[in-house]
Design a protein with these regions (language model features):
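Flexible glycine-rich surface loops and low-complexity tracts that mediate binding to linear polymers
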Residues: 99-101
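Exposed extracellular interaction/assembly regions and N-terminal maturation sites
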Residues: 1-87, 103-115
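Short proline/glycine- and polar residue-rich coil/turn motifs
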Residues: 87-93
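Short strand-edge motifs at loop-to-beta-strand transitions and within beta-strands
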Residues: 95-97
Length: 115
């Protein structure tokens, strides 16, 4: 797991762990890494899938995931934005989210919230 407790761009290595925690008392924006950097970290090809859990149960404010370069919210996330496209994670006992990252090439991926 990697801890990100202040607004930042997540590194490809942090996202590749599959588990990010945040315990910040302030609202925190975490930007997904570029498709190029994350693709290189994972040695991704079209069809590579990574599940990422963001754990904000120890935080006191929301975490907002921000789409980075060469990443887009998936079609499911766009058409059903309130669930599959929700990039905000509450704090406290309900503060868990799971995102599925699906690569369309070695340098580009889509993001879907799956839990």
């Amino acid at each position: 797991a990697s801890a990100i407790n202040a607004t930042a761009v997540a590194t490809a290595a942090e996202v590749a762990t599959g588990y990010i925690t945040s315990t910040s008392a302030a609202g925190t924006n975490i930007t997904f890494p570029t498709g190029t950097l994350l693709g290189a970290e994972l040695q991704a090809t079209a069809g590579t899938v990574l599940d990422l859990v963001v754990d904000n149960t120890g935080g006191a404010s929301v975490v907002t995931m921000v789409v980075g370069t060469n990443a887009i919210v998936s079609d499911a996330g766009t058409t059903t934005a309130a669930s599959f496209g929700d990039l905000t994670i509450a704090s406290g006992v309900t503060g868990m989210a799971k995102f599925t990252l699906l690569f369309s090439s070695a340098t580009a991926y889509t993001i879907t919230r799956t839990a």
